[in-house]
A protein has these predicted regions:
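Conserved glycine(s) of the Walker
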Residues: 143
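Conserved pre-motif I regulatory segment
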Residues: 14-139
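Transmembrane signal-anchor/signal-peptide helices with a preference for the extracytoplasmic
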Residues: 8-12
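N-terminal cationic and glycine-rich segments that engage phosphates or anionic surfaces
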Residues: 3-4
């Protein structure tokens, strides 16, 4: 208990490691307000294509006689690397998109649904944690 006061809890230390990534997301997010909707859609498509191409390039570079499980593991590793590479920009685009549609409503299954959310930093920290394959629990008790 005393050590936790000096060094912080494991959770505090883990969150502190994520703060530089959160800062990058928020810095990039700030630049997106000047982009058009079409710019964001185009960039999102480019990011998707990047991930797909990384998978394809890895699959094509592997020997055909390679064990199927090993082959799939290598392709998955390439895909994860691509997702890690685009994560900051993808999360910034999502945050900007949420800001733009905040206050909009849709009719879904006969019910009016109002979008009222732009992700808070703590939610982005949870998303970064989930992206890395770890379990995340919000202070509200909401776990993923």
């Amino acid at each position: 208990m005393i050590l936790a006061k000096f060094f912080g809890t494991k959770s505090d230390r883990e969150m502190k490691k994520l703060l530089p990534t959160l800062d990058k997301i928020n810095q990039l997010y700030e630049t997106f307000s000047s982009k058009t909707d079409e710019d964001l859609v185009t960039r999102t498509q480019e990011l998707k294509e990047f991930v797909i191409n990384q998978r394809l390039e890895k699959a094509q570079s592997l020997h055909a006689d390679m064990d199927q499980q090993e082959r799939e593991a290598e392709i998955l590793k390439a895909e994860q690397g691509a997702l890690d590479f685009i994560m900051v920009e993808a999360f910034a685009i999502v945050k900007e998109t949420c800001r733009r549609i905040c206050g909009s409503s849709w009719r879904i299954s006969g019910q009016e649904t109002l979008w009222e959310m732009v992700p808070y930093d703590v939610q982005l920290l949870g998303a970064i944690t989930l992206h890395s394959g770890k379990v995340s629990e919000m202070k509200t008790g909401e776990g993923k």
